[in-house]
């Protein structure tokens, strides 16, 4: 069995690393700051990817793929964009290696590129250069496209899934004839992310817009969803950007409208990444290891055959195989435990560590009584149930687990969110871990001072701010148009 999991209240950071390791999700790679996603982690990402991909297609989007390498000059054409990403960019300067006099491999001086290439940190620049060729008329609009890719943003303090130099993600890039259409698209895709987080990840999120200092480089407005982790910190789980005409102007992307007038195109971009796996872990997992919502778990059910001699093996395995067929006929993802050399307790613990939502165990006594032992991962509850009607019972139980995980996370968020009126109360909430709704005077100076003194940042400005009362900034006493959400964050 894998190593023990450090309790959350003892060392939350180590607990997270233990859950990732014991859950067989990922490990650090020889390339500093990068991760190796293991089969269990990749299967989880594939389930997330496939569901999101279908949701994108249901809203009219198609997939394409752009190169990993971006000409350096493209990054320079949108000033805010290059400033925001410059410190994170990996740069390709040579096309081959050679051996020096001592036999060591070095970049071949003769292979220096005439132009450097940026390893993709995000694709707005190369995509909008291409869109300027694809778009000529209003008849070419809208363009609703997405790509699944890897990106590189050089990270000095890596943490598996949460911050790595290379990660997997999707990035949508759309082009529109009007500002209204583009804003509606950005809001629509934020709603898609919200639905995915709530209904599939069982992770409650809050919607809003970012402050100017937190806005995506080159965007007019950035919309976001924020989730609360078990330590009370926030995780930015997805962003959708209204880019205005900034990239269209930078890359001279215009179209002829219905009145035969030339206009710049309006744009959006939006994305989520393997960072969502980190959010999933920190929302649901416990001191026994990984906990996964059934809708996304690589295997929703594991069947554990229990027998103690050759005479018992045949009947037990036949029953387990029939059970597997019945469950799979109901669309349930099932794994058969074939590890017959370890003890039942070891095998049970291994599946707990990997987060399988439901465990079914069948032994000789269960055959006699036509029963199955069923154990839930989320509550650790066990019960003996009849094999008759087992597929329907398992399906209902998986639905209940999905709902229960969301309810538990929703309750945690509510219990650790406070409305605060003064700075002392604010510091207390932030200090113990939680979300704080507080008044802010709208200045970047106050925002920066609060972050410096408490490490808390403004996670979002709510869309429904008109429902929030006006007041005074908790720190400066200056007028505030409404409350914003503060928290420490990953």
Curated annotation (Swiss-Prot):
Keyword presence, Magnesium: no
Places the protein is found: Cytoplasm
Enzyme class: ligase
Pfam families found in the cross-reference section: HGTP_anticodon, ProRS-C_1, tRNA-synt_2b
An individual GO BP term: prolyl-tRNA aminoacylation
UniProt KW Translocase keyword: no
EC number, as in UniProt: 6.1.1.15
Catalytic activity: tRNA(Pro) + L-proline + ATP = L-prolyl-tRNA(Pro) + AMP + diphosphate
Gene3D superfamilies linked to this entry: Anticodon-binding domain (3.40.50.800), Bira Bifunctional Protein, Domain 2 (3.30.930.10), C-terminal domain of ProRS (3.30.110.30)
GO molecular function: ATP binding; proline-tRNA ligase activity
CDD domains: ProRS_anticodon_zinc (cd00862), ProRS_core_arch_euk (cd00778)
Chief subcellular location: cytoplasm
InterPro entries, per the entry: aa-tRNA-synt_IIb, aa-tRNA-synth_II, aa-tRNA-synth_II/BPL/LPL, Anticodon-bd, Anticodon-bd_dom_sf, Pro-tRNA-ligase_IIa_arc-type, Pro-tRNA_ligase_II_C, Pro-tRNA_synth_II
Entry comment, domain topic: Consists of three domains: the N-terminal catalytic domain, the anticodon-binding domain and the C-terminal extension.
Family indicated by similarity: Belongs to the class-II aminoacyl-tRNA synthetase family. ProS type 3 subfamily.
Binding partners and assembly: Homodimer.
Function: Catalyzes the attachment of proline to tRNA(Pro) in a two-step reaction: proline is first activated by ATP to form Pro-AMP and then transferred to the acceptor end of tRNA(Pro).
The protein's name in its UniProt record: Proline--tRNA ligase
């Amino acid at each position: 069995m894998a190593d023990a999991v450090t309790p959350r209240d003892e060392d939350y950071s180590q607990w997270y690393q233990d859950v990732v390791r014991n859950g067989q999700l990922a490990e650090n790679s020889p390339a500093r700051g990068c991760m190796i996603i293991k089969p269990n982690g990749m299967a989880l990402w594939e389930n997330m990817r496939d569901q999101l991909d279908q949701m994108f297609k249901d809203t009219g989007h198609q997939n394409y793929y752009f190169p990993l390498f971006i000409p350096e000059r493209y990054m320079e054409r949108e000033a805010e964009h290059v400033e925001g990403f410059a410190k994170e960019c990996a740069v390709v300067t040579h096309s081959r290696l050679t051996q020096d006099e001592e036999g060591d491999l070095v970049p071949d001086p003769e292979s220096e590129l005439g132009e450097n290439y940026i390893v993709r940190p995000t694709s707005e620049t190369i995509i909008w250069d291409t869109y300027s060729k694809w778009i000529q008329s209003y008849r070419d609009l809208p363009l609703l496209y997405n790509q699944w890719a890897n990106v590189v943003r050089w990270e000095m303090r890596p943490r598996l899934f949460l911050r790595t130099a290379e990660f997997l993600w999707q990035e949508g890039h759309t082009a529109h004839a009007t500002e209204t259409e583009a804003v509606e698209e950005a809001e629509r895709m934020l709603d898609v992310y919200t639905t995915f987080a709530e209904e599939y990840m069982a992770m409650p999120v809050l919607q809003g817009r970012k402050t100017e200092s937190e806005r995506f480089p080159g965007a007019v407005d950035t919309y976001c969803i924020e989730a609360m982790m078990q330590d009370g910190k926030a995780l930015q789980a997805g962003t959708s950007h209204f880019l205005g005409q900034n990239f269209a102007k930078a890359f001279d992307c215009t179209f002829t409208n219905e009145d035969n007038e030339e206009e710049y195109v309006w744009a959006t971009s939006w994305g989520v990444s393997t960072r969502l796996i980190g959010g999933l872990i920190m929302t649901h997992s416990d001191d026994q290891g990984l906990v996964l919502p059934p809708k996304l778990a690589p295997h929703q059910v594991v069947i554990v055959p229990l027998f103690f001699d050759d005479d018992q093996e045949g009947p037990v395995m036949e029953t387990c195989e029939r059970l597997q067929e019945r469950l799979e006929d109901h669309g349930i993802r099932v794994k058969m435990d074939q590890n017959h050399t370890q003890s039942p307790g070891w095998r049970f613990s291994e599946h707990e560590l990997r987060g399988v939502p439901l465990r079914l165990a069948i032994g000789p006594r269960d055959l006699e009584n036509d029963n199955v032992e069923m154990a839930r991962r989320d509550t650790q509850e066990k019960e003996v149930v009849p094999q008759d009607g087992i597929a329907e019972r398992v399906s209902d139980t998986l639905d209940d687990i999905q709902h229960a995980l969301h309810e538990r996370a929703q309750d945690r968020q509510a219990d650790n969110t406070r409305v605060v009126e003064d700075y002392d109360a604010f510091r207390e909430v932030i200090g113990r871990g939680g979300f704080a709704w507080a008044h802010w005077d709208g200045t970047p100076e106050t925002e920066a001072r609060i972050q410096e003194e408490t490490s808390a940042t403004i996670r979002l400005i709510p869309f429904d701010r008109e429902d929030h009362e006006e007041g005074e900034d908790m720190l400066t006493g200056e007028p505030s148009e409404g409350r914003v959400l503060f928290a420490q964050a990953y």
